[in-house]
Regions:
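Hydrophobic alpha-helical segments
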Residues: 1-192
Length: 192
């Protein structure tokens, strides 16, 4: 079995982490190969899952917005693995395929309102290396959102900064569930 440049061990080899795997599957609908790669270091896997759980349990911004923030940041960084995960995640939270597909044209898209455009401006800027976030991004966001909401948005971007590097560096192989979503739902709409 191979799911990264390091090869890959069977899930069965990490039976001590099975409870965590089930929680992750319950949230995502499948177990990401990135968690199998992290499972080699159980403390890393537990700590990362706890951080992700804290960020995604925010009551200040909705799950669809979180997934779109993560998608924009991942598009900006170029991580195809995370792009597939977050586009699928956005769809699972109720974001329609046309809106997901239009994310690279969000400034002109009728699918995004001005507040969402301000959020995506930051996510795309912050996803770049070097980071291109500026005071203007936050001034624009403060027209629509509280500091607490913006902090949670930045947490999503930062979390995916880690995931984008982790998965691109290890060459994580995409799982069937997000791959099927991209192939069946987004590619017919022009997704590349």
């Amino acid at each position: 079995m191979s799911y990264s440049f390091l090869g890959g061990e069977s899930r069965d080899n990490f039976s001590d982490q099975e409870d965590l795997f089930k929680v992750i599957e319950g949230f995502m609908g499948y177990l990401p190969n990135s968690h199998l790669s992290m499972a080699v270091n159980p403390q890393l896997n537990q700590s990362f899952a706890a951080l992700a759980g804290t960020i995604f349990s925010s009551q200040k911004i909705d799950q669809g917005s979180m997934q779109l923030i993560a998608l924009a940041s991942s598009l900006s960084s170029g991580c195809k693995y995370c792009q597939a995960h977050t586009s699928h995640g956005a769809h699972q939270t109720g974001v329609n395929e046309e809106k997901i597909n239009d994310i690279l044209r969000y400034q002109e898209s009728p699918h995004y309102d001005d507040s969402e455009k301000a959020v995506l401006d930051l996510a795309f800027a912050a996803g770049k290396t070097p980071n291109q976030a500026e005071q203007e991004h936050f001034d624009n966001l403060l027209e629509y959102f509280s500091k607490e909401q913006i902090t949670d948005m930045v947490a999503v971007i930062a979390l995916f900064g880690f995931l984008n590097r982790w998965n691109d560096t290890l060459g994580s192989h995409l799982e069937d569930v997000p791959n099927s979503f991209v192939e069946e739902k987004l590619k017919p709409l022009g997704w590349k």
